Structures are given as structure tokens and as C-alpha cells.
Amino acid sequence: MNNTVINSIIGNDDIVKRHNVFGVDVQNPTLYMPQYITINGITSTDSNCDQHVVSTFEIRDQYITALSHVMLSIELPEVKGVGRFGYVPYVGYLCIQHVSISSYDDILWESSGEDLYNSCLDNDTALTNSGYSHELNTISTGLTPNDTIKESTTVYVYIKTPFDVEKTFSSLKLADTKIVITVTFNPVSDIIIRDITFNYDNFVKDFVYVTELSCIGYMVKNIQIKPSYIERPRRVFGQLNQSTAVISDVHSVSSLSVYIKPYYGNADNKFISYPGYSQSEKDYICVFVERLLDDLVTVCDTSPKWFPETAELVEVPNSGIVTIQDVDIFVRIDNVPCNMKVYFHTNILVFGTRKNSVTYNLSKKFTTITGTYSESTNRIMFSHVSHSINITDVSIPVSVWTCQRNIYNGDNRSESSKNKDLFINDPFIKGIDFKNKTDIISRLEVRFGNDVLYSETSPISKVYNDLLSNHKCGMRTLRFNFTPPTFFKPTTIVANPSRGKDKLSVRVVFTSLDPNNPIYYISKQLVLVCKDLYKVTNDDGINVTKIIGEL
């Protein structure tokens, strides 16, 4: 080593002024013993699980002085019968509509199931345990009434709360107080995917939410409870297709999130396909294309008779070129018997309105289709398919293709294909497509009272939210708190009601979509989620007070 470097260290005489970075003085912690606690709850006696069901769990133990890391286990029954069936990914979180922790009828903390799910997107273990597996999410088929479509299993839902942030520091101190955790469940229709053949009514009649609640309880000797702060999410839904929404009673808010949800109406949410466990954009498109190909190209001795009268099928000529208006499609199927012909469906799914002369035709989105016909199975094995089908095409519900706005008979598939359509009622879908790929917001403006708090014409708040949360959740978020937890009170924007600063108003400009595309006509709903700041004290039981002004 260079002598100059050595002398600069040895000869330095200000050691007393410096802090040791090679060791620390170890502190003796408070004496405590953690343990796992499991509780059976009381479930409301509702004979029909297609309505909201409520389970309550009471926690009171003279030896447990603090708790954290709440876990809800949900038993999913064995599923038997005829038809196609699967559970939505992360089914445990989708089971939950609302959860609250209360003491003597005062709510300490509450959250929706969707907010719980969003908070755990960076926790792969929590997501997997909540019901993300091939066994649960793959669409399985039963052929006879005694066929087992799904085995019974249990999913474990981590209910992430502010009391888990810093383990013992942030744990909920009970102070010899009874705690009640209440879980409201979603209808069964929100957690399953099925076709029209599956006996949904019988399944709902027999379905019962069987649950247990677990948590980590701490036995603490001489606990010294200190005041603390927690953030509680609060959400507001805007009016359908309106570009503005307002959150009132804003006093101390640590963040604001904005996103769009699709609204399909009261009609059955039927879609043409669903990939099941694998959820990439490619998986969605591949499954959709496979469904269409069964009707798009057929081999028959005469023109197929199993399509509706409005279906237009043409015989593929020897050249293999099928022309639909200004589009040429190349179709070649090998090994076709001499007494049979290849037919192409030229209007499998079409959409048009009186205001627009352009017809949206999915048959025109295919450019090349090649394959080999198997006479023994009467099926075509496709070897190459070139197309421009995208995720928005996949995300169009059947009801839009068949709606009154469409001047055409939009759905010209065979009855066999229509019977394979799936009912999907996922309440956690964001954006207007299944993967939230289409950024439906082109401009965002947030006002605090009458003053513009933030404005953007590019999705900077969305990019930063993905970066800071380490996951993609499709939300634009303004964070007002970057303060380290436990030792510091979270920073917030503070209300000033005398100047009208007690509400957050959000206005968005929706991205321009092609009015010829059916996705244009899906209703949109603006959703705002803010996190209000509360102070937790233990003067006489557990008290949670909303922060009204700067303290």
C-alpha cells in the first residue's frame, strides 16, 4: 500500500469525533415471545353464497399484548359436474370485498379486497398462496356428472396492514382490548370462470365460505406503548364515462392513486376465451386465435351448415388466395381428400355502426393460415398462422359483438363455438383490456381545492409508481410521503378548509380510440384511492383518530 495512504490513516488524531462503522453497541430488547394464533370465526347464515357473506373473528387474550401479519385461510370445495370451470388467479383476494379491524365498534383500519391485492403485488409468495397455480386456474373440463373438475384445496390470503410495516415496532398493541376482524366476501360469480354447460346454480347453492384467521401474537413483558400513525385507504368511484371525480373530506393524505375500470353492465360477462393460469399477453392472444381458427377454416364436402344464416363462407380456390374487400388472405391446408373442400369464414366477428362506414372484421386480421387436415380426427392441425389480433380484440365481451349498436349480425360463429364461451366477472380488471396495456388516460390533472396540484401529459406518475413499488399495477400514483416509517410521522398534504382546500379533484382526458373498434363502446369508470392518515393511541383501550390538521 502506498505510504501516503498509510500515514494519512495512522497519523489521523480525530478518532474521538468519528463513529464506528465496523460495529455497533447491541441493545437488549424487550422480553417477548411470538406465537402463531388461529381463530375460527362466525359466518353469517346466508343460504346463498351468491350474495355477500360476512365472517367475524374475535381476538382477546390476556397474554397477547400485540399482533401483526394477519392471514385468512379459505377452503375451496371439490368441484364436480359437466362443463368447463376454473378459479380466477389469486382467487383468495378476489373472495374478499372488504376487511376491517375494529375495537368496541370503532374501526381501526379497513381496506377493500382490491386494495389488499394491490398492496401485495410485489410479494410473490403472498400471491401464490392466495390461489395462483395450474391446479386452480387452468380451465378444466368435466364430461359426466361424477367427473371431478377441481380437487378441494385451501388458499391463504395475507391481509397486509400498516401493523406489519416494521414488525414489532408497528404491531397493533392490544392494551387488553378485544379486537374484531370482519371480512365481507364477494359473490361466488366473481371468483370463478365457467361455460354455459356448467351447473352454476347447483354450485352456488352448495358453496359455503369456510374460513380461519391466523396472526402472529406477541406475549410482551412490560410493554411500553407509544403513539403511532397508520394510513387507511379510501376509494371513490366516478360516474360512468365521466372524466372527473372528487374525493372530499381531505385533511391529511399521504398518497393519491388514479386508474380506470371497465364497466360491462348487468349483462352476463361472457368472453370468447381465457388462458387460465398463464396470463401473459401472448397467452391471451394465442388462446383467442385458437378458438377462432376452429370456425375460420373448415374442411367439408359441401358448404358447412352449422353456422348462422348471416355467416359468409367461401371456398378456398386452388391459388389459396381469399379476398375480403381490400385484404388478401392466403390459406393452404394439405392432405385434404379429393371429395372435400376447404372453406374460409369471411365474417366470423364483425362490428359496424350507422355513423361509420368502416366495418371491423376479425376475419380480415388474418393474413396466412397453413396446416394439415387429419381425416381420422376430422380436424386441422395448423402449422403457421399469421395475424394482427391484439389484446383489445381478446378483451371485447360477446355482448358488444351482439349489441343493438352493431348494425350487423356481429357474432357469426357456430353454436358449438358459442357454447365454449366463458363467464368472467373479475372485479380487479383495470383499464379496458385484460392486461391494461392500452393507456386510456392521455392527460391527468389534480386540483387541491381550486389550485392545480399536479398535471401531466405523459404517464410519469404511472412509471414512477411501477418503479417505486417494484411491480406493474396500472395505476397513476402521487406520493406525498417518502419518510422512513416507525420513527417519523408520515408526511401529507394538509387541508385548509377556509381556503377550500379540503378536496382533491381529478380530471382526465381519455385517449382517443378508433370508433370503428368495438372496444371503444365499453363503458369506463374513473377510480380514485387516497390514503388518509390516522393517529393510534392507547390511553383507554385502542383509539384511532383521523388527522385533521398539522400537529
Curated annotation (Swiss-Prot):
InterPro entries in the record: Poxvirus_Rif-R
GO CC, any one term: membrane
Localisation per UniProt entry: Membrane
GO biological process, one term: response to antibiotic
Keyword Membrane listed: yes
Protein's membrane topology: Peripheral membrane protein
Keywords noted in UniProt: Membrane
Predominant localisation class: membrane
Pfam families (alphabetical): Pox_Rif (PF03340)
Role played: Scaffold protein which forms a transitory spherical honeycomb lattice providing curvature and rigidity to the convex membrane of crescent and immature virions (IV). This association occurs concomitantly with viral membrane formation. Targeted by the drug rifampicin, which prevents the formation of this lattice, and hence virus morphogenesis. In the presence of rifampicin, irregularly shaped membranes that lack the honeycomb layer accumulate around areas of electron-dense viroplasm.
Note: Displays structure similarities to capsid proteins.
Protein family membership: Belongs to the poxviridae protein D13 family.
Record's subunit section: Homotrimer. Self-assembles to form a layer. Interacts with A17 (via N-terminus); this interaction is necessary for D13 association with membranes.
Protein name: Scaffold protein D13 ortholog
Species the sequence originates in: Swinepox virus (strain Kasza)
